[in-house]
Amino acid sequence: MKHYKVYQIDSFTRTKLRGNPAGVVSNANGLNEAQMQQIARELNNSETAFIFTPEKSADYDVEVRFFTPTAEVPICGHATIAAHYVRAIQGTHTQGRALQKTKAGILAIDTLRQNGDFAIQMTQATPKIKPPLDKNVVSKITRALGISESDLREDCHVCEASTGHGKVMIGIKDLHLLHSLTPNMSALASISAQIQCNGFYVFTLDENDEFLAHGRMFAPAIGINEDPVTGNANGPLGAYLVYYGICKGLQNGDEFSFFIKQGEAIGREGQMQVRVSIKNGKPALVQIIGEAVVAFETEIVL
């Protein structure tokens, strides 16, 4: 029998019970895949992170695996923030860079000191932007969201963007409409099976607001009807905006940095900063920065 330390972390916020909750098991060595899936199902967060200490000869500092209540996923933004926030408050890694092994590759994570607490910067995987989706598929998506195609922004192609875990980018014109969406989740799940992409990120843009983007992310195909605040949607959003030259006036030379807000419609408001490094006019590197707070901690004996 072993005692496993379990944290409930609210990511992308400093306020408990806001932002995006993630489970973190900080000493996961010894757990098998079935046990990790059972723990993730028991905690019932959108994702739970399992932290493994590697062998000393490894070319990375820490391994983290991510499970939804129903399946393992390659990477998760808010659970990465949560996992490294736990490592910081435990004193394992309190400042500077660590290399994190994931199913999406080895990624750089930076622990920062901000206002007497910690913030976590996640360098995401190489951005990839796929071609716009077929018009028939776009029509299915808008019907599933309960909107018309005239609600879509003309400058925003509906396509998949990824920095490790792809999302369909759907830019719409109106913030009130965004907050009032009530999607047909079974229809979205069917579309996911068709296009082999599990997440739909609906967003608005306002270049004159403190928060450039507001968004909502739906992923019913993997058991997440709505994710409150999504690192692996907003990082790809930054790459997508650079790729298509949207909000180009806000770019500062070879860098594009902005803040987003998400989760307002479901009472889990959170925010993050997105940074995109630009090379030859295209997104080359994407980073997100988020805060976190401990909601509670406990242990499980297995």
Could you tell me what each predicted segment is?
Residues 1-18, 147-150:
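N-terminal, positively charged, Ser/Thr/Ala/Gly-biased leader segments
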Residues 17-20, 76-77, 112, 211-212, ...:
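Short glycine/proline-enriched turns and hinge-like loops at secondary-structure junctions
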Residues 21, 25, 79, 166, ...:
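Gly/Ser/Thr-rich beta-alpha loop segments that engage phosphate groups in nucleotides
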Residues 22, 26-36, 40-62, 66-68, ...:
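Acidic/His- and Gly-rich active-site-bordering loop/insert found
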Residues 73-76, 224-238:
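Short glycine/threonine-rich catalytic loop with a Thr-x-Gly-x-Asp
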